[in-house]
């Protein structure tokens, strides 16, 4: 079940919170903090602020343990002062909690044995408090009893994760040493084929390289393997990367990983200087390799396949790895003698924005002495016709009147939806059973789109969430199709399930595929916390291919209906002018380039003033000197370091200094001095008091 936050507090802390709230005026300071905590919990902006001004994350609530600890100690201190109204509150609020749990579970108390024991221990604790007061037990006896119950609660909580029999957590555990071995063999040793010289390069994986859910770890694995993967960039490190990724409509971008694999987009890889791409061996098809790519080969001329290196526990890509070499990657630093204004750039669609950066760098602030050019629109719109697939499900008893009525309803849904989508895909719906329909976008003149990269742009998405009544109607229709009686008991069970299902379906999933490439994206629900962001426009890369692609199949799930303002197919080629532009940028790369951990040096030579263009994420920490003279930097290409370089030959040096490092060191030093003074002052006061006694 999705959740916004789970607060794991003990029964003792629960009673401490109730006790503090009852004595609100006496504990106004602690109760004020409780209220602030509750209000902050309801506001995603608070969680986002504590998560370095990024997406919401409720890790900040770990601070609440300090408050809960103080409240618990106050409860123990005030044990002798507890009266009958305190005990009534403890009992009444706990019974109310159980009633709420019963209601949200569909008026059943269908909870796990572990949860049931926790509730029993809560009432045992209340009984212990009441009994200790009635029998006038000592404070030590009370504490021993509370500590015993607390230990039992901890044992019960940890039992599910530590039990030796198969449970929820047990199958997720790996064999000892498997994780380390898997990291080292993640690319089947293909990373060893990369050059180990001083030449700078970046790498990436193809989308869907690793299918396991744990694949999100690849963002860190690349750093351990030293492959310079573009997925290792994080938004919390540098906002500029996220701005660039969102600008070009990278659908893989999320708050935690702004680039990921860049959705496999050819031009984005070139712009970021991606030299090597890791691909699964069983997906290799020479006709799907874009211009400028070639597979790494053995001495005999055959494609070099790095055999699969499985690890105990099923950690493996099951096929092996090959390496593509990209000859169109752009230099880390180059100079260009033209620029495109940000205003002209913003008028382009997301695909043409990406292509514009090949024509000339985008400058937020115009650079004097460098000519401005008009960006050319490269992407070609692909005409298509929508075909709604018929509902294939047939009732078991097709002769019944109700079955025939539902079949007729399904046909009407398909026909009406076909009419709605006659001028383009605008509405995706479900049949009367709740099954989402499938849509084929039939391409006009498919031979025109060979040897090009296809993109599907989806904009203005609005999901229609399911209702409780709709959920029950779908289940009733399924019962008719299966010729199964929909009994009262079954309806009650469906109602209970709907209480949870309605909350789960607060996001949706959309996929598009050709015969040679599939792609998808998810609109995460608000309960997804760190990965949640509203998606109103998405670009899905359907890949490059010289094959004939006739149909793009679109599917959706998790919601009964999805309304779309506009669906557009676009195609981009990489021959002719594109290749000339790539070669021109490569020719003007930084000469004698040397890259170290925080410094880049080299020489530029140009007949006119030019724009220094890099794929280094912009930060105020980067300082540029030209011929040992400080030069101001600025943002180029919506997120990277750039600057003006005068005509002629120049020595260029880019060096990174962590912003605020010196100020932070000074503040830390002042804090240490204040701490030392405070310790000395308190020590002096303690010695003075001792001497007076």
What are these regions (language model features)?
Residues 270-273, 286-292, 315-424, 557-577:
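Catalytic cores of secreted or luminal carbohydrate-active enzymes
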């Amino acid at each position: 079940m999705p959740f916004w936050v789970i607060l794991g507090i003990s029964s003792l802390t629960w009673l401490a919170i109730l006790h503090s709230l009852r004595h609100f005026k006496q504990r106004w300071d602690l109760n004020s903090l409780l209220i602030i905590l509750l209000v902050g919990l309801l506001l995603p902006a608070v969680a986002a602020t504590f998560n370095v001004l990024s997406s919401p994350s409720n890790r900040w609530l770990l601070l609440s343990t300090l408050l809960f600890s103080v409240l618990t100690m106050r409860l123990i201190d005030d044990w002798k002062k507890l009266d009958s109204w305190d005990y009534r509150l403890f009992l009444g609020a706990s019974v109310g909690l159980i009633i709420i749990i019963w209601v949200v579970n569909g008026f059943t108390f269908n909870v796990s044995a572990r949860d049931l024991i926790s509730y029993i221990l809560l009432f045992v604790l209340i009984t212990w408090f009441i009994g200790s007061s009635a029998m006038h037990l000592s404070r030590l006896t009370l504490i021993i009893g509370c500590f015993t119950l607390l230990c039992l609660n901890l044992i019960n909580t940890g039992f599910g994760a530590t039990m030796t029999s198969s449970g929820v957590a047990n199958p997720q555990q790996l064999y000892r040493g498997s994780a380390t071995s898997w990291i080292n063999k993640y690319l089947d040793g293909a990373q060893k084929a990369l050059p180990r010289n001083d030449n700078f390069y970046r790498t990436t994986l193809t989308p869907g390289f690793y299918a396991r859910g744990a694949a999100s770890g690849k963002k860190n694995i690349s750093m351990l393997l030293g492959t310079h993967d573009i997925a290792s960039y994080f938004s919390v490190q540098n906002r500029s990367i996220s701005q660039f990724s969102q600008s070009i409509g990278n659908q893989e971008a999320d708050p935690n990983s702004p680039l990921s694999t860049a959705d496999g987009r050819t031009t984005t890889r070139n712009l970021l200087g991606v030299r090597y791409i890791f691909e699964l061996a069983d997906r290799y098809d020479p006709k799907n390799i874009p211009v400028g790519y070639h597979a790494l080969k053995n001495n005999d001329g055959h494609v070099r396949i790095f055999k699969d290196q499985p690890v105990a526990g099923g950690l493996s890509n099951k096929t092996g790895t090959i390496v593509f070499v990209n000859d169109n990657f752009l230099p880390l630093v180059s100079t260009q003698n033209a620029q495109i204004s940000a205003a002209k750039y913003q008028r382009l669609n997301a695909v043409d924005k990406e292509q514009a950066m090949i024509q000339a760098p985008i400058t937020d602030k115009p650079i004097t002495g460098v000519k401005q050019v008009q960006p050319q629109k490269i992407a070609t719109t692909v005409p298509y016709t929508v075909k709604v697939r018929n509902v294939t499900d047939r009732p078991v008893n097709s002769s019944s009147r109700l079955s025939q009525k539902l079949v007729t309803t399904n046909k009407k849904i398909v026909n009406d939806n076909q009419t709605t989508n006659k001028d383009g895909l605008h509405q995706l719906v479900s049949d009367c059973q709740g099954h989402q329909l499938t849509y084929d976008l039939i391409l006009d003149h498919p031979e025109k789109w060979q040897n090009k990269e296809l993109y599907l742009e989806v904009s203005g998405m609005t999901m229609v969430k399911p209702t409780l009544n709709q959920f029950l109607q779908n289940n009733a229709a399924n019962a008719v199709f299966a010729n199964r009686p929909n009994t009262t008991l079954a309806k009650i069970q469906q109602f209970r399930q709907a209480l949870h299902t309605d909350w789960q379906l607060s996001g949706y999933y959309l996929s598009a595929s050709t015969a040679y490439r599939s792609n998808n994206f998810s609109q995460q629900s608000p309960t997804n916390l760190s990965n949640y962001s509203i998606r109103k426009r998405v670009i899905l890369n359907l890949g490059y291919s010289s094959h004939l692609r006739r149909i793009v199949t679109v599917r959706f799930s998790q919601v009964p209906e999805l309304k779309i303002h506009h669906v557009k197919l676009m195609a981009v080629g990489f021959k002719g002018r594109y290749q000339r532009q790539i070669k021109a940028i490569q020719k003007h790369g930084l000469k004698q380039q040397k890259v170290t951990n925080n410094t880049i040096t080299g020489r530029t030579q140009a007949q006119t003033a030019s724009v220094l263009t890099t794929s280094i994420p912009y930060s105020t920490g980067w300082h540029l000197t030209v011929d040992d003279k400080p030069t101001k930097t600025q943002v180029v290409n919506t997120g990277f370091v750039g600057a003006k370089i005068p005509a002629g030959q120049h020595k260029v040096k880019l060096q990174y200094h962590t912003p605020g490092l010196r100020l932070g060191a000074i503040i830390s030093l002042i804090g240490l001095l204040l701490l030392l003074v405070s310790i000395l002052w308190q020590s002096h006061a303690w010695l003075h008091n001792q001497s007076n006694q």
